[in-house]
Amino acid sequence: MQSVVNQDWRGALIRHLLLVLAASLVLGVVSGHYGWALALGLALYLGWTLWQLLRLHQWLRNHQPDEPPPDSYGLWGEVFDNIYHLQRRNQRARGRLQAVIDRIQESTAALRDAVIMLDSDGNLEWWNLAAENLLGLKTPQDGGQPVSNLIRHPRFKEYFDQEDYREPLEIPSPINERLRLQFHITLYGNREHLMLVRDVTRVHQLEQMRKDFVANVSHELRTPLTVIAGYLETLLDNVEDVNPRWLRALQQMQQQAGRMQNLLNDLLLLAKLEATDYPGDNKPVAVDALLASIRNDAQALSAGRNHRISLDAAPAVQLKGSEAELRSAFSNLVFNAVKYTPDEGEIRIRWWADEQGAHLSVQDTGIGVDPKHLPRLTERFYRVDSSRASNTGGTGLGLAIVKHVLIRHRARLEISSVPGKGSTFTCHFAPAQVAEAERKAPK
């Protein structure tokens, strides 16, 4: 098609030049000045061409989107006609695209969830009606405003700036504290943001009811269990007074009472962790000393199973947070490694820091976990193998506690495992949680 158009243009140009030459030749015959006649003819043709170029230039500079190009004839008539047809095609394509955009905007406007489009700098570009109802956005005066100026919650600003959107954020609505909103942010295009906001107030209320129920039941069961465990301990401390037929039954009762107490303690700890978003005592923690203490406890737990437990901890790297919560999380990881690693196996504990933050890894040569179970390991009471849990005395809440402690300390848990070869649990802490140890002045 392009070659045919080029041939038409060349043919039209040759015809126009031949016409100018013929007219100049006739004028030269009449006047007797062939050179001047030819020069005059070419000058007139050049002037006409320049005039058409000027018309095209003015149209391109000043025309409205739907204004057609100027009329002409001959070669320039074909140029303007082609521009007109191209303009019409673009108008039709633009109309189709606008119809698609309108349809998308109409469908998103009908959503009950808020949909907000932000540019690469976090400024508002477009939002639907639900965003106005949930966040109080106003059309059109909020257009172009930074989203952090309109949603002023400190956790939102921190969440938005860190650009780690793998987990959603839950905060109260900026216009109604009773509403609980969940934010999902996705990066697309040239670092632009698509933000989805959902009202999860009802889910939050049900979750709070569940937490309160578990906490209350745990508290109510704690006292009778303590009484039962105390009587069982008293009876077993006086074995000579116990009928031999009841001795094994009492020992089993004491074992199960101990498991119930551990379960209640874990449930109460989870309820405490879920009650607030951040630990109250956010102080620098000497992780190397903490891990050394946990390693000693792990060696005592190993109790003759000949585990090789090594520790490599950077003493200069500390964490800001709750020492009690960190001890609970780290000891859960290390004690699990001891429980699920065969006799004479190896457990490596490593603590270090780099430009991405601080990291704790617990690597073992245990039985490992099938990859299909890894995404659910941190769920409450999730069992890879129920018989395995009963043999080790676990409550099924250890990794759930680890997950909640890490969330409260701006960290995440990474799990890798190969069945039959072992597992590695790695805690990744954000740079903001890292605190350098104070260096003592030389004496």
UniProtKB/Swiss-Prot annotation:
<dbReference type="InterPro" id="IPR036097">
    <property type="entry name" value="HisK_dim/P_sf"/>
</dbReference>
<feature type="domain" description="PAS">
    <location>
        <begin position="93"/>
        <end position="182"/>
    </location>
</feature>
<dbReference type="Pfam" id="PF00512">
    <property type="entry name" value="HisKA"/>
</dbReference>
<dbReference type="Pfam" id="PF00989">
    <property type="entry name" value="PAS"/>
</dbReference>
<keyword id="KW-0597">Phosphoprotein</keyword>
<dbReference type="GO" id="GO:0000155">
    <property type="term" value="F:phosphorelay sensor kinase activity"/>
</dbReference>
<keyword id="KW-0418">Kinase</keyword>
<dbReference type="InterPro" id="IPR014310">
    <property type="entry name" value="Sig_transdc_His_kinase_PhoR"/>
</dbReference>
<dbReference type="InterPro" id="IPR035965">
    <property type="entry name" value="PAS-like_dom_sf"/>
</dbReference>
<keyword id="KW-1003">Cell membrane</keyword>
<dbReference type="InterPro" id="IPR003661">
    <property type="entry name" value="HisK_dim/P_dom"/>
</dbReference>
<dbReference type="GO" id="GO:0005524">
    <property type="term" value="F:ATP binding"/>
</dbReference>
<dbReference type="InterPro" id="IPR000014">
    <property type="entry name" value="PAS"/>
</dbReference>
<feature type="transmembrane region" description="Helical">
    <location>
        <begin position="17"/>
        <end position="37"/>
    </location>
</feature>
<keyword id="KW-0808">Transferase</keyword>
<keyword id="KW-0812">Transmembrane</keyword>
<protein>
    <recommendedName>
        <fullName>Phosphate regulon sensor protein PhoR</fullName>
        <ecNumber>2.7.13.3</ecNumber>
    </recommendedName>
</protein>
<keyword id="KW-0547">Nucleotide-binding</keyword>
<dbReference type="InterPro" id="IPR005467">
    <property type="entry name" value="His_kinase_dom"/>
</dbReference>
<dbReference type="Pfam" id="PF02518">
    <property type="entry name" value="HATPase_c"/>
</dbReference>
<dbReference type="InterPro" id="IPR021766">
    <property type="entry name" value="PhoR"/>
</dbReference>
<dbReference type="Pfam" id="PF11808">
    <property type="entry name" value="PhoR"/>
</dbReference>
<keyword id="KW-1133">Transmembrane helix</keyword>
<dbReference type="GO" id="GO:0005886">
    <property type="term" value="C:plasma membrane"/>
</dbReference>
<keyword id="KW-0902">Two-component regulatory system</keyword>
<dbReference type="InterPro" id="IPR050351">
    <property type="entry name" value="2-comp_sensor_kinase"/>
</dbReference>
<dbReference type="GO" id="GO:0016036">
    <property type="term" value="P:cellular response to phosphate starvation"/>
</dbReference>
<comment type="function">
    <text>Member of the two-component regulatory system PhoR/PhoB involved in the phosphate regulon genes expression. PhoR may function as a membrane-associated protein kinase that phosphorylates PhoB in response to environmental signals.</text>
</comment>
<feature type="domain" description="Histidine kinase">
    <location>
        <begin position="216"/>
        <end position="433"/>
    </location>
</feature>
<feature type="modified residue" description="Phosphohistidine; by autocatalysis">
    <location>
        <position position="219"/>
    </location>
</feature>
<dbReference type="GO" id="GO:0006817">
    <property type="term" value="P:phosphate ion transport"/>
</dbReference>
<dbReference type="InterPro" id="IPR013767">
    <property type="entry name" value="PAS_fold"/>
</dbReference>
<dbReference type="GO" id="GO:0006355">
    <property type="term" value="P:regulation of DNA-templated transcription"/>
</dbReference>
<keyword id="KW-0067">ATP-binding</keyword>
<keyword id="KW-0813">Transport</keyword>
<dbReference type="GO" id="GO:0004721">
    <property type="term" value="F:phosphoprotein phosphatase activity"/>
</dbReference>
<keyword id="KW-0592">Phosphate transport</keyword>
<dbReference type="InterPro" id="IPR036890">
    <property type="entry name" value="HATPase_C_sf"/>
</dbReference>
<dbReference type="InterPro" id="IPR004358">
    <property type="entry name" value="Sig_transdc_His_kin-like_C"/>
</dbReference>
<keyword id="KW-0472">Membrane</keyword>
